[in-house]
C-alpha cells in the first residue's frame, strides 16, 4: 500500500473498528441551549455532518454544574442533557459513525457567575493567569479559586462516574476524560497548580491519584475498551506547568497502561502552532508514545501531509483534526480526493447561530451548486 494512504486504513480502538485514522478533535463551539446547557437540533446536524471520521469526540461536556466555566457549553449531568445527546448519538450511528463524549470539569477556570455566586474550585487556591471566563456578561476576570476538601475530591470522582453512566444512557460508544488544557484533572496532575498536603497532593503518585480514580470510575461503568483520556503535557493554559513534565507525564502514562484503555490522546502540536512546545522545552509526546501500550492519538496543527508522515513514522496510530473539521465536515472525502478545503471563519468559532457551525458546504453540495451554475450558463 502507498504510504500516503495510511490515513484511510482501518484501525481497532478499544471495542471499535474504525474505518480510517482521522479523529474529530473535541472542540468547544458554544452552541448549546443556554437554558440547561442542552445540545440542540443543530448539534445533531453538526456531528452527523462529520460522521465519516474514524471517530468523533464531542466538545467538552460538563460532568456537573460545578464543572461549568463557559456559557453555551453542553453538560451530561441532567436528564434533559442526556436526552439531547441521545438524539446526537442515534443520528450519528444511523449515519454509520462512532462517537465518544469528552467528560469535562474546568476546575479553577470558571467564575462565580456559573457557581451560584460561589468561588470556582481547584486542587489548590491558585489563580489561573492569562485567561478569562466567558460569561453572559462577556469576558470576565477569573478569581482565585477555593481548594477542594478531601471529601469533595472524592465526590467529584463520583460526579465523573455518574457522567459516565449518563453517557452510556445517551448511547455514546465511549468517553474521553478531559485531562488536558489546564482544567481540573490537569490541575491535579501538575505541581504548579497542586500544592495539596493530603493524599491528592505532594508526590507524583499522589498528584496522579485523582486522574487515576476518575479513569477507574469510568472504566467501572463502561469497560476499559470504551474509555480514553486526553493530555497536554507541554500546554500552559492558565499558566499551568510542572517542575518535571517528562517524569510526571511518564508516570501517569505508565499507570494508564494498567487499565488497557481504548486510547491515549496527546496534544503536542507541530512547531509554529500555539500549542507547540516552547523554545527550550523538550517535547514529551514521543516519550509517551514509547510508554503507552495502546492506541495513541496525536493532535495539534496537522495537515494531511504531516499526518501521513506521523503515521508512517509510527509517531501515532491516529491523528485528531480540529480547525480543518470546523469548515470541512467531509474532511475524509476531501483528503481522499485531493480536493481543496473550505476556509474557516474564526469569528464564528465560539457562540452565535448556525452560521459558521453547520452551513459549511460539502463537496457534494459544492458540486451540485456548480452544476446549477453550469445550467444557467448553458440555458
Give the positions of each predicted feature.
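Flavin-dependent oxidoreductase catalytic cores
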Residues: 1-379
Amino acid at each position: 500500500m502507498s504510504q500516503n494512504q495510511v490515513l484511510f486504513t482501518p484501525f481497532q480502538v478499544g471495542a471499535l473498528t474504525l474505518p480510517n485514522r482521522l479523529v474529530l478533535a473535541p472542540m468547544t463551539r458554544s452552541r448549546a441551549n443556554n437554558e440547561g446547557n442542552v445540545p440542540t437540533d443543530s448539534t445533531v446536524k453538526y456531528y452527523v455532518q462529520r460522521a465519516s471520521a474514524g471517530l468523533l469526540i464531542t466538545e467538552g461536556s460538563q460532568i456537573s454544574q460545578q464543572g461549568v466555566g463557559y456559557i453555551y457549553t453542553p453538560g451530561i449531568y441532567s436528564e434533559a442533557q442526556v436526552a439531547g445527546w441521545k438524539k446526537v448519538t442515534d443520528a450519528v450511528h444511523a449515519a454509520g459513525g462512532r462517537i465518544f463524549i469528552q467528560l469535562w470539569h474546568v476546575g479553577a477556570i470558571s467564575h462565580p457567575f456559573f457557581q451560584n455566586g460561589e468561588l470556582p474550585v481547584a486542587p489548590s487556591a491558585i489563580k489561573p493567569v492569562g485567561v478569562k471566563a466567558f460569561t453572559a456578561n462577556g469576558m470576565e476576570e477569573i478569581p482565585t479559586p477555593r481548594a477542594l476538601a478531601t471529601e469533595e475530591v472524592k465526590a467529584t470522582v463520583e460526579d465523573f462516574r455518574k457522567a459516565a453512566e449518563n453517557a452510556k444512557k445517551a448511547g455514546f460508544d465511549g468517553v474521553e476524560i478531559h485531562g488536558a488544557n489546564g482544567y481540573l484533572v490537569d490541575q491535579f496532575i501538575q505541581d504548579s497548580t497542586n500544592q495539596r498536603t493530603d493524599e491528592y497532593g505532594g508526590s507524583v503518585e499522589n498528584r496522579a491519584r485523582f486522574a487515576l480514580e476518575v479513569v477507574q470510575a469510568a472504566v467501572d461503568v463502561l469497560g476499559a475498551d470504551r474509555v480514553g483520556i486526553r493530555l497536554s503535557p507541554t500546554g500552559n493554559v492558565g499558566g499551568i506547568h510542572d517542575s518535571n513534565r517528562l517524569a510526571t507525564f511518564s508516570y501517569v502514562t505508565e499507570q494508564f497502561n494498567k487499565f488497557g484503555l481504548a486510547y491515549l490522546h496527546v496534544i503536542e502540536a507541530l512547531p509554529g502552532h500555539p500549542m507547540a512546545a516552547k523554545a527550550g522545552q523538550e517535547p514529551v509526546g514521543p516519550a509517551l508514545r514509547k510508554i503507552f501500550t495502546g492506541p495513541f492519538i496525536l493532535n495539534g496543527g496537522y495537515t494531511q501531509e504531516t499526518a501521513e508522515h506521523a503515521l508512517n513514522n509510527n509517531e501515532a496510530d491516529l491523528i485528531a483534526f480540529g480547525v480543518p473539521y470546523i469548515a470541512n465536515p467531509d474532511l475524509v472525502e476531501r483528503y481522499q480526493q485531493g480536493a481543496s478545503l473550505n476556509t474557516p471563519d474564526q469569528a464564528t468559532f465560539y457562540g452565535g447561530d448556525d452560521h459558521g457551525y453547520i452551513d459549511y458546504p460539502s463537496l457534494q453540495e459544492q458540486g451540485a451548486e456548480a452544476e446549477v451554475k453550469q445550467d444557467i450558463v448553458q440555458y
